Amino acid sequence: GATTYFRSFVENLTDEFAIMDEIKGFTNIVSYEDHMVIEHPDEIAWDILIRMELLTSLPDYCTTHTMSEKQVIQLGMDICNALEICEEKKIIHRDIKPDNIFVNDRGDFKLGDFGIARTVEKTMSGMSKKGTYDYMAPEVYLCRPYGQTVDLYSLGTMLYRFLNKNRLPFLPFGNLRPDD
């Protein structure tokens, strides 16, 4: 029942922590420090405490800052730097989207939330359709074999959206309002 669910949830988080620990210390990746899991068996509850660097999520940042073209280019370069590290470590993030990008107080963009990230070996042996549909590469959506390039597709889609008044690519222009 509930205990099995929570135990499975914690195991998935432990996988994420292992990935984040492997890539910590790189400029454009959220810095994970450590975590603690506290089980409360009498209440069938768990506390999961995660210590990371303090950052602002990209959506929150965008509520108080207008992203200039120069900042969007910087965002792309910073996340490409993060993806280069992921490529070296054979990690596919699989969920590049604004909610998983963070900004520090110097304006550096960082990739975070490796909750559904997988190593290349695991992904190739067991394909799954995980991610956010708006940013999902066609091969992931179609459950076809995929590799690390799916993250570049998602990043490109996100950058396109920032540079085109929040409009996703491949939508017919007839869906736009006259003021768009």
Residue ranges: model-predicted function:
Residues 43-57:
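Conserved short submotifs of the Hanks-type protein kinase catalytic core
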